[in-house]
């Protein structure tokens, strides 16, 4: 059961990293469109908006590390839930 939990956590970590990387690339493409639109049609605080749309610092390595962090937290939650008292003892009923 432990091996299955670890395998599922690692699988979902890589799946999350792939989806996050695709989403960030899509957002970066959209951000370049918005930045070019802001240059042609200036708005108040346009530079602030353009700077907030920068996804250049987020690399696939960062998304992979974030996904691994999610997997570790999910495993920690699963292990802490599985080591708690059985349901019958926690509610005060006797377990046969």
UniProtKB/Swiss-Prot annotation:
It is found in: Membrane. Residues 1-30 form the signal peptide. The chain crosses the membrane at residues 55-75. It comes from the Eukaryota. It is a single-pass type I membrane protein. GO terms for cellular component: membrane. Residues 31-54 are extracellular. Keywords: Membrane, Signal, Transmembrane, Transmembrane helix. Residues 76-96 are cytoplasmic. The keyword Membrane applies. This is Uncharacterized transmembrane protein DDB_G0286141. It comes from Dictyostelium discoideum.
């Amino acid at each position: 059961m432990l091996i299955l939990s670890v395998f599922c956590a690692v699988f979902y970590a890589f799946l999350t990293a792939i989806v996050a990387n695709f989403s960030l690339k899509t957002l970066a493409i959209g951000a370049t469109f918005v930045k070019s639109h802001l240059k042609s049609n200036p708005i108040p605080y346009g530079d602030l908006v353009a700077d907030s749309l920068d996804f250049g610092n987020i690399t696939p390595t960062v998304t992979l590390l974030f996904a691994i962090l999610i997997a570790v937290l999910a495993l920690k939650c699963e292990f802490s839930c599985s080591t708690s008292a059985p349901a019958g003892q926690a509610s005060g009923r006797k377990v046969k």
